[in-house]
């Protein structure tokens, strides 16, 4: 599977030949991809995005072509794009390949859970839009912000990141953007031995006993509000709930590493005090 995706990336990179002067209608697939285009000041070229594109507000007013991990071919084609910018986690691969075969320039950009991947992603996107100088400027700005945020004091805390999308909790382990952000903020992920996102039960939460719980805003909403979340089985008995250390975060801030990563670090460091 990894080899197939790698070969697809090479193929798409080789076949994406649209001139930057022709890039007027862009479809973005992936919340961070969309956010970067806007951070570069090029949001006016975006004609559609996907359901993970939650920031900035302007992105919410665009037509949606589905979810970036299960992109519908027809939805993208119907927007008549001259460029598709896709996270490397977008798919299915066959859809991206088909877009390229239809003559639609489809560029897959770096999207690993690290700030270095973020910097590569910015430069790749800026290059495709013909604004490499803006990409360099944005990267420098974010590097400085991240360095300043990391230098801020924090207290080591045993933390957990929870997501509720289907009524039950999933928790972030190693290899996720959430884990990387926790580490950058000087926090210890209680599930660092776990790979990826996995379900966590009320009993499991009680045993893990995190000092700090980070939960996404959408998950709090899905749980019926913050008070209802605090009272959920397994949550109420944790040290985090006892000491009122439950931090609600913007979904993209904690679940991805995008242009506002320094803001995420600042929020987590403040929550740890």
Model-assigned labels for residue ranges:
Residues 1-8:
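Bacterial N-terminal signal peptides that target proteins for export
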Residues 11, 15-16:
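N-terminal signal peptide c-region/cleavage motif recognized by signal peptidases
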Residues 17-21:
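Sec/Tat signal peptide C-region and signal peptidase I cleavage site
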Residues 24-25, 117-127, 136, 217-273:
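Structured C-terminal subdomain patch of bacterial secreted/periplasmic proteins
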Residues 25-79, 83-89, 208, 226, ...:
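A short, structured surface patch at a secondary-structure boundary
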Residues 25-37, 133-187:
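Basic- and aromatic-lined ligand-binding clefts that recognize polyanionic substrates
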Residues 50, 172-197, 217, 247:
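His/Asp/Glu-enriched short active-site or ligand-binding loop at hydrolase and phosphoryl-transfer sites
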Residues 94, 110-123, 160-177, 221-224:
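Extracytoplasmic ligand-binding site segments that recognize negatively charged/polar headgroups
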């Amino acid at each position: 599977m990894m080899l197939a995706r790698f070969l697809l990336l090479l193929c798409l990179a080789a076949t994406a030949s649209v001139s930057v002067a022709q890039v007027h209608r862009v479809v973005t697939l992936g919340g961070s991809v969309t956010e970067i285009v806007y951070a570069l000041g090029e949001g006016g070229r975006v004609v559609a995005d996907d359901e993970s594109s939650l920031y900035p507000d302007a992105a919410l007013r665009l037509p949606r072509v589905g979810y970036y991990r299960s992109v519908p071919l027809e939805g993208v084609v119907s927007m008549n794009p001259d460029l598709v910018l896709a996270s490397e986690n977008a798919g299915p691969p066959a859809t991206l390949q088909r877009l390229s075969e239809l003559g639609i320039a489809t560029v897959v950009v770096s999207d690993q859970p690290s700030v270095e991947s973020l910097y590569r992603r910015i430069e790749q996107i800026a290059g495709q839009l013909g604004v490499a100088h803006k990409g360099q400027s944005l990267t420098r700005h974010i590097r400085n912000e991240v360095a300043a945020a990391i230098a801020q004091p924090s207290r080591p805390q045993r933390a957990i990141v929870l997501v509720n999308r289907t009524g039950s909790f999933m928790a972030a382990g190693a290899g996720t953007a959430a884990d990387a952000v926790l580490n950058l903020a000087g926090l210890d992920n209680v599930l660092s031995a776990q790979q990826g996102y996995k379900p966590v039960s009320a009993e499991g939460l009680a045993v893990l006993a995190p000092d700090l719980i980070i939960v996404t805003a959408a998950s709090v909403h899905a749980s019926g509000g913050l008070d209802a979340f605090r009272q959920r089985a397994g949550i109420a008995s944790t040290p985090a709930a006892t000491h009122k250390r439950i931090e609600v975060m913007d979904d993209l801030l904690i679940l991805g590493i995008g242009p506002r990563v320094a803001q995420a670090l600042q929020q987590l460091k403040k929550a740890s005090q």
